Amino acid sequence: WLAEHGMDLLEWQPSDSLTDPTCGSGTFLLEAIRRRRKADSGATARSLLAGIHGIDLNPLAVLAAKGSLAVFLSPHLDPAQPVRLPVYLADAVYPAALDLFSNYSHVLQTEVGPREFSVPERMIGHPDFFRVFAKVRMLIDADYSAAKICSSILADLQGIGLDPSDISIVGTTVGNLVELHDQGWNGIWCTILADRFAAGAIPPSSHICGNPPWVKWSNLPRDYAQSIQKHCRGLGV
């Protein structure tokens, strides 16, 4: 009832877009899709998901939200027209940011210190973005060197339309990922980064609706609190 009430207050319409920055198990996303399906019983999975995005910091919440969406959309899924469920493991308060050179950058706080990663904006918007990052993870797990990985994905990057400057930026990110792997951190960072870049690149939504958690500042991890303090002040919160 909370999702219904919240979206009624917003006067959300099926033609509107929606982002839930702390989506949990996806209740508000499901409500938006339910309303779209009610308005158009012949809608495809792609049209039902268009402009709908969820973000959460909890991996289990993201998994639950994706599972809920998959079940709810099952009558509309078509193997000939696959869709990606738009729920991302990311921090809505501290997203990947677009710089002056049209690259998205993000700093991961790891136990071996902060690591900055960047990818070109045009890469994130391409349908093959997640596939390329999945390939990088597979090659990292196979103990490929950074140079060998870059060589293996060169054709993929060129197919996306990246120029030599863009490819160099991706190469630096691959090198940082390999460095983490060499220090005992596995390639799961590829999956985490892909989601955080995709979340940062979510286009502006007509509506933001959700039920965010309430956490005392003093209960946040010290390093995390320090990293977002300046950003929060800039937002006026």
Question: What is each of the regions a protein language model found here?
Answer:
Residues 1-237:
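SAM-dependent methyltransferase catalytic region
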